Amino acid sequence: MAMSSLWWTAILLLALTVSMCYGVPTYQDFLRTHVDFPKTSFPNIAAYCNVMMVRRGINVHGRCKSLNTFVHTDPRNLNTLCINQPNRALRTTQQQLPVTDCKLIRSHPTCSYTGNQFNHRVRVGCWGGLPVHLDGTFP
């Protein structure tokens, strides 16, 4: 009996570990990767993108992300989209929000970006009542 309980406990711990490593992105990941409010000030858009991609830890293990979007709004404006929504629901803001697209222009020797600023509607993916994925932006 004790061996059986130990076996099931080990299986449960393994399942939890795997789900944490390969599971759904978290709200904290979403905020770190896509929300910059209030917008951090830099002398130009290229400097903004180059510093923010490093500061937020978006490029890891020598890999440069080809495109990343930062949304410059209070996170609560995005959180409200996911209230009472099922997991994996995609929701789009009705209003346009300020966003910055950071696009990779060179990957060696270091990641280098250029940027563009827009006012776009923002589509997010929801999980657990919170945004966890930026699905895109639209004029």
UniProtKB/Swiss-Prot annotation:
Residues 1-21 form the signal peptide. SUPFAM superfamilies: RNase A-like. Transmembrane segments: none annotated. The keyword Secreted applies. It is found in: Secreted; Nucleus; Nucleus, Nucleolus; Cytoplasm, Stress granule. GO terms for biological process: angiogenesis; defense response to Gram-positive bacterium; hematopoietic stem cell proliferation; negative regulation of apoptotic process; negative regulation of translation in response to stress; stress granule assembly. PROSITE patterns: RNASE_PANCREATIC (PS00127). Disulfide bonds join C49-C102, C64-C111, C82-C126. The active site is at H34, H133. One of its GO terms (cellular component) is endocytic vesicle. PANTHER family: ANGIOGENIN-RELATED, RIBONUCLEASE. Homodimer. Interacts with RNH1; inhibiting ANG ribonuclease activity. Belongs to the pancreatic ribonuclease family. Keywords: Angiogenesis, Cytoplasm, Developmental protein, Differentiation, Disulfide bond, Endonuclease, Hydrolase, Nuclease, Nucleus, Protein synthesis inhibitor, Secreted, Signal, Stress response. The lineage of its organism: Eukaryota, Metazoa, Chordata, Craniata, Vertebrata. It is an enzyme of class 3 (hydrolase). GO terms for molecular function: endonuclease activity; nucleic acid binding; protein homodimerization activity; RNA nuclease activity; tRNA-specific ribonuclease activity. Secreted ribonuclease that can either promote or restrict cell proliferation of target cells, depending on the context. Endocytosed in target cells via its receptor PLXNB2 and translocates to the cytoplasm or nucleus. Under stress conditions, localizes to the cytoplasm and promotes the assembly of stress granules (SGs): specifically cleaves a subset of tRNAs within anticodon loops to produce tRNA-derived stress-induced fragments (tiRNAs), resulting in translation repression and inhibition of cell proliferation. tiRNas also prevent formation of apoptosome, thereby promoting cell survival. Its EC number is 3.1.27.-. SMART domains: RNAse_Pc (SM00092). TRNA binds at C102, V122. Pfam families: RnaseA. This is Angiogenin. InterPro entries: RNaseA, RNaseA-like_dom_sf, RNaseA_AS, RNaseA_domain.
